[in-house]
Amino acid sequence: MECLTPPAEVPVDLAQLRAHLRLEEGEEDGHLQHCLDVAVAQFDGDDGELGLALVHQVWQQSFPHVPGAGGSVELMLGPVASVDQIEVYTPAGSWDVVTSPELFELGGRSYVQARNWPRPGRCPLPLKIRFTAGFGTAADVPKPICHAILLFAAHLYQARSPVVVEGKPAEVPLSIAHLVAPYKSWWR
């Protein structure tokens, strides 16, 4: 899976984090931005804990097989806003565009289906699907996810080194896990 176009904005910005922490403008902005970047990365994208793209971004997923007629493949990152292009490597050695694909959801998972998939040629990954994933703009990201990002960034800012209480390492606040639990993909 490859991110072709990263999000144009983040769900929570530096001003929001600064306000959450009640800090003055300019105060430790470099460290704050680092904490915010880590917190967003914790939840966003293919490597994020949720298995979701938060703000619209373009991804390409490649597959080792091409389904038969009427078959489908699962896109591993949601929510899928649109399927932008599907290509199949042909026996002639070129990439053919699949027309009229259908996007459907089943059990919170996104699938792409086509009535007639082209016959693939020899290629380790003969099927490429480019799609846009994310809730929309930063304002469209569910508020519990945004709040979890704020809490996690604040935790990183305040606990600048591993915290040990009575010989045990302190963990990230449990409330963060509760905020994002309804949004987690089943396979994460």
Predicted regions: what they are:
Residues M1-R188:
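Divalent metal-cofactor coordination and adjacent catalytic microenvironments
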